[in-house]
Amino acid sequence: MECVGARNFAAMAVSTFPSWSCRRKFPVVKRYSYRNIRFGLCSVRASGGGSSGSESCVAVREDFADEEDFVKAGGSEILFVQMQQNKDMDEQSKLVDKLPPISIGDGALDLVVIGCGPAGLALAAESAKLGLKVGLIGPDLPFTNNYGVWEDEFNDLGLQKCIEHVWRETIVYLDDDKPITIGRAYGRVSRRLLHEELLRRCVESGVSYLSSKVDSITEASDGLRLVACDDNNVIPCRLATVASGAASGKLLQYEVGGPRVCVQTAYGVEVEVENSPYDPDQMVFMDYRDYTNEKVRSLEAEYPTFLYAMPMTKSRLFFEETCLASKDVMPFDLLKTKLMLRLDTLGIRILKTYEEEWSYIPVGGSLPNTEQKNLAFGAAASMVHPATGYSVVRSLSEAPKYASVIAEILREETTKQINSNISRQAWDTLWPPERKRQRAFFLFGLALIVQFDTEGIRSFFRTFFRLPKWMWQGFLGSTLTSGDLVLFALYMFVISPNNLRKGLINHLISDPTGATMIKTYLKV
């Protein structure tokens, strides 16, 4: 489940054993043939956890900027990602039925927002509300991912009416049957209500719309941006903002030499069951308990995953098996196998399946080049939190401020050409020094956590939940400042066993993200 708030996290992972507990690598090779996929793929060789020396995918990728862009789009699991994106959601309104069309040949727009997800709709609505002439461009697709959220965060956004179910308690299981209570209410968001609310804001603010894919953004001699669409329409605008998801490398430039992107994958099902051990009054944030009951660990058990469970009633639940983060994408079929094995071990018998979900979230990777003239927002702007895998709350909360900066830029430059220095003001709003320090900290942790097996991750959480409550709750809620995160790390260091301290020091010295984190923190 893609979560609007913070569901799972990857700041640091440690082992309490005498040596680091590293993940074993088992190659899982699948061959697929894609002939009718719009991305121009011919064939893909996928490795679910193969050796680092093997290529993760070999394909013709006409619509991707490079290998990294392809991985962000779905990589070896792209068929499942497409299945998720193209689900039928008849209850959600079509944008083309609610928004007026962009008027072709009727002068330049102030702003074009490319992408129709939560980030794109929110930014378009907020910008138009400030008096800008805003056009929204992108495929007319519904919201298909299930969303979970800390209730107070959505209340702060004025979106409490979009929550369809609330659990007053949220719990975590590690390696026994005694749960850790989070002490914070958690909600399930209605995809339909969220889509309708953001669309309503676009309608009321006067956003126009074109259902099309964008091929390129170029600059005209007069300084206008020319947004070329695949239907041969070219939309002129004073400024273009890309909000079309993480795989936006053909429209944006990213910093060279940054960390390799990792991926969080999850397979979920909403089902009717005969019986369930989960309390309908409690949302299960993470369940890392052993579910195999086998003395000899199987292939599936070597991949660290946890169960995420939303019990709407005693018999209707949403289950999701999640791989926190991995350098090599964990395949959905393996996640499904693990989920079914887990449910079987728990004695849960499925009577009816209402929906399947394939959640694919790129985490980490490089920041956009903040010198470029085109802007970005949401996942395209690397706003996905490396420690949680989510970006929607940040996108929705920062849309008003970002729109205000864009409006101010355009007001100041009414008779001037938009240039990189002006665009830099908007980039600095998204990525001020404080945000960069936080991100550097989380990237360091992400590089650490992908090394560990299930027991190593459990070891981390046993230490994590010994921290002061404000610390681990603040981490889960993404409210800790960069200074707080330093205190977080120091406290973890103090209460951890000696082997953990040694391991953290070695990782800080040997991994490039350690040097980057220190350098970023030392910048004035």
From Swiss-Prot:
Disruption phenotype: Delayed greening and virescent seedlings. It holds the Pfam family Lycopene_cycl. Its EC number is 5.5.1.18. NAD(+) binds at residues 111-139. It is found in: Plastid, Chloroplast membrane. It catalyses: a carotenoid psi-end group = a carotenoid epsilon-end group. The chain crosses the membrane at residues 441-461, 475-495. Signal peptide: none annotated. Keywords: Carotenoid biosynthesis, Chloroplast, Isomerase, Membrane, NAD, Plastid, Transit peptide, Transmembrane, Transmembrane helix. Disulfide bonds: none annotated. GO terms for biological process: carotenoid biosynthetic process; xanthophyll biosynthetic process. Residues 1-45 form a transit peptide. It is a multi-pass membrane protein. GO terms for molecular function: lycopene epsilon cyclase activity; oxidoreductase activity, acting on paired donors, with incorporation or reduction of molecular oxygen. Changing A447D: No effect on catalytic activity. Pathway: Carotenoid biosynthesis; alpha-zeacarotene biosynthesis; Carotenoid biosynthesis; delta-carotene biosynthesis. InterPro entries: FAD/NAD-bd_sf (IPR036188), Lycopene_cyclase_b/e (IPR010108). GO terms for cellular component: chloroplast membrane. Involved in carotenoid biosynthesis. Catalyzes the single epsilon-cyclization reaction which converts lycopene to delta-carotene and neurosporene to alpha-zeacarotene. Required for lutein biosynthesis. Belongs to the lycopene cyclase family. NCBIfam families: carotene-cycl. This is Lycopene epsilon cyclase, chloroplastic. It comes from Arabidopsis thaliana (Mouse-ear cress). The lineage of its organism: Eukaryota, Viridiplantae, Streptophyta, Embryophyta, Tracheophyta. The gene is LUT2.
